[in-house]
A protein has these predicted regions:
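Solenoidal tandem-repeat scaffolds enriched in leucines and small polar residues
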Residues: 1-17
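Extracytoplasmic beta-rich repeat domains
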Residues: 1-4, 27-44, 69-90, 118-133
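WD40 beta-propeller blade core
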Residues: 19, 57, 106-107, 146
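Short loop/turn segments that connect beta-strands within beta-propeller blades
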Residues: 22-25, 60-63, 109-113, 149
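Hydrophilic extracytoplasmic domains
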Residues: 100, 108-149
Length: 149
C-alpha cells in the first residue's frame, strides 16, 4: 500500500524497491533497495518500514537517507524463525510497534531504533496493530483482542 504525504508518494514492494515519487510529475525522487509487504509509516521528517528481512528502518523522507536500522528478533535459533512473519510498524506514544506471527509484539524507539521491550501475546498476529486513543489493539490468530497503553 503506497502512502501519500504532501506531494510525495512512498511505495514499497516485494521486489526490493522502496521509492519516493513526486505526486504531480511522477518523477522518482529517490529509491532504496528495501523490499517489504508491509505499508510504510510516515511521521514528521521520517518514514519507517519493516523489510522482508525483518529489519526496521528509519529513513529521512526528503533524501532517502537511512538513519538507523534494527533487526527484529523473530526467534533464538534459525529453526525458531522458519515461517515466522512480522507486521507493522505502527507509531504510538513514541514507540514503533511490530507484531509477529509467533506471538510477540515489540516496541522500538523511533529515535534510536533500540528495542524498548516486548510482550508475549496469546497467539500469533498476522496484521499490524490498530491504535485508538493511544491504545494499541492486537488481534491474534486465535481471535483474542488485546489492548495495551
Amino acid at each position: 500500500n503506497p502512502v501519500i504525504d504532501g506531494s510525495t508518494v512512498y511505495a514499497v514492494g516485494n521486489n526490493n524497491i522502496l521509492v519516493a515519487i513526486d505526486l504531480r510529475s511522477g518523477a522518482r525522487i529517490w529509491e532504496r533497495e528495501i523490499g517489504s509487504i508491509n505499508q510504510p509509516w510516515v511521521a514528521g521528517k521520517f518514514m519507517f518500514v519493516l523489510s522482508n528481512n525483518y529489519d526496521l528502518f528509519a529513513i529521512e523522507k526528503a533524501t532517502g537517507k537511512i538513519v538507523w536500522n534494527t533487526q527484529i528478533p523473530l526467534g533464538k535459533t534459525k529453526e525458531d524463525k522458519v515461517g515466522v512473519t512480522a507486521s507493522g510498524p505502527v507509531l504510538t506514544s513514541n514507540r514503533l510497534l511490530i507484531a509477529t506471527s509467533n506471538g510477540y509484539a515489540f516496541a522500538v524507539s523511533p529515535y534510536t531504533g533500540k528495542i524498548l521491550g516486548f510482550i508475549t501475546l496469546s497467539d500469533g498476529v498476522g496484521i499490524p496493530p490498530v491504535v485508538v486513543d493511544n491504545t494499541a489493539l492486537f488481534a491474534t490468530d486465535d481471535a483474542d483482542l488485546t489492548a495495551y497503553k
